[in-house]
Regions:
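Terminal low-complexity/charged segments
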Residues: 1-186
Length: 186
């Protein structure tokens, strides 16, 4: 049933979905532009073809290079964060994964919150905000879950240098650990 739902969207609104893939294990993978995500989720939640759908997880990950080639266009960005929404239909046991395609706007602007549609998204968006630094527009609860208040670090973002700036060396004379600048020896 969901296959026909997404095929109908691809036929009537081709600019909403960039890619649509269905698998044997009742999983559907959709690559969506982030400005259509909220409206597609509203349609998923309140349409009769997918009556009992729930949001299971929102997660993000980082890659060294993120480039996706689809049949319609090529997406290649310097941003390395991908945001994935995981939905589950309780009646048909279908799983839907919505992947945000416009990754450059994920880091530069705020994503629209799904808090009005799914109550579980409040907690999941707080996790993403805290761990990856992703901001959500319209979010009411901005408390931290795990980090201390005032801590602006994002532990899951790989913003550290790939080459060490200092080395940790054990000094036998002073019987302590010493940080020395990294040097290459010839």
């Amino acid at each position: 049933m969901l296959k026909f739902f997404f095929l109908n969207i691809m036929k009537n609104l081709p600019w909403v979905l960039i890619s649509n893939s269905a698998f044997r294990n009742k999983s559907t993978l959709l690559i969506v532009a982030d400005y259509w995500l909220y409206y597609l989720v509203l349609h998923l939640r309140f349409s009769t073809s997918s009556r009992c759908i729930q949001l299971v997880e929102i997660f993000a990950y980082e890659n060294a290079t993120m480039s996706t080639l689809t049949s319609r266009q090529s997406i290649s960005n310097t941003s390395t964060t991908a945001v994935i929404y995981h939905f589950h239909n309780l009646f048909t046991q279908d799983r839907i994964f919505l992947i945000l395609a416009d990754l450059s706007s994920v880091n530069s602007t705020n994503l629209k919150t799904l808090g009005e549609v799914f109550s579980t998204s409040q907690w999941l968006e707080r996790e993403l905000n805290e761990m990856y630094g992703l901001c959500f527009r319209g979010k009411k609860d901005l408390r931290n879950l795990m980090l201390q208040y005032g801590d602006s670090s994002t532990p899951f973002r790989k913003i550290y240098p790939s080459i060490g700036l200092t080395e940790l060396i054990y000094d036998t004379v002073t019987d302590s650990l010493v940080h020395v600048p990294t040097s290459t020896q010839i």
